[in-house]
Amino acid sequence: MCDEEVAALVVDNGSGMCKAGFAGDDAPRAVFPSIVGRPRHQGVMVGMGQKDSYVGDEAQSKRGILTLKYPIEHGIVTNWDDMEKIWHHTFYNELRVAPEEHPVLLTEAPLNPKANREKMTQIMFETFNTPAMYVAIQAVLSLYASGRTTGIVMDTGDGVTHTVPIYEGYALPHAILRLDLAGRDLTDYLMKILTERGYSFTTTAEREIVRDIKEKLCYVALDFEQEMATAASSSSLEKSYELPDGQVITIGNERFRCPEALFQPAFLGMESPGIHETTYNSIMKCDIDIRKDLYAFSVLSGGTSMYPGIADRMQKEITSLAPSSMKIKIIAPPERKYSVWIGGSILASLSTFQQMWISKQEYDESGPSIVHRKCF
């Protein structure tokens, strides 16, 4: 384990995308969809060197003849056979490494069930024979990536959004809140409101097009009502987008109506507070003495936090909820799409972290429950 040559592997498994690479790097080497596809009909692919399953981009490109499954739902692994396939693909096809030669740092969702952490640990040691491993909470890694150990993280990806208050490097479980509203829901919502404009997007292939429109053209309005008025009175907010078939569509108020659902979940028919209120509620569940530190360092992380305008809007909304004397700072690092992975890369390469790994020997002595004693 003291061998300097062997880089640790860092794997951040999200509901939508898997990010993987080597500790010490400043960005993940591999980023691919967290999907496993199986042929719908036996014998359709005879002579194509048919495999019984496909992972990631290959599954995505062959989706016409496959049944696609996401083994991670709302941040939590629900299908271990498929998850194992994703890890296998990560090590052998994407990173091209032998997992038995590298320590592996995995990430987990906040409030991940205990049994899940044990299962991850077991698969790493028993299936992949890793020499050492560690499981870290995603939001905590995002905070490390921003160079702090105390703050609140609003981590929003494809499948789930969490607000996680962290004090001196430890997530405070009683104050963590989960919102089942994230990127996938916003893509669905954009499909719906584009349909109202007369464009038809229904198939899974078309859904990918809408996701691209969302990522390229959507933004968060600072004042929603005012933006709606501007959009109604002029065409200044309209943008055009060329579909793969050459047809050009025009999109106006949909650009900011789509991500507005993060602040007004009622748009999606959900009776829950928006991301600003959820963040505030998380802070209010914490001890009164640390709230000031949380308000002063509120970090946005994950792919769904990438909309232009989101940080200014969060600043405005939280300022109106918080006590008037409170200093509020929203941090939105440019690389926040990958900040969980980056935090993992930083953590796994710290010299002080090297004694934190769970070794194969410790696992053999204690079994999977060792993870609760060493990773918290």
UniProtKB/Swiss-Prot annotation:
GO terms under cellular component: cytoplasm; cytoskeleton
Positions of modified residues (N-acetylaspartate): D3
Propeptide position ranges: 1-2
Gene3D superfamilies: 3.30.420.40, Actin, Chain A, domain 4
Keyword ATP-binding assigned: yes
Compartments, as annotated in UniProt: Cytoplasm, Cytoskeleton
Top enzyme class: hydrolase
CDD domains: ASKHA_NBD_actin
One term of GO molecular function: hydrolase activity
Stated family: Belongs to the actin family.
Protein name per its UniProtKB record: Actin-2
Organism from which the protein derives: Saccoglossus kowalevskii (Acorn worm)
The organism's taxonomic lineage, starting at the top: Eukaryota, Metazoa, Hemichordata, Enteropneusta, Harrimaniidae
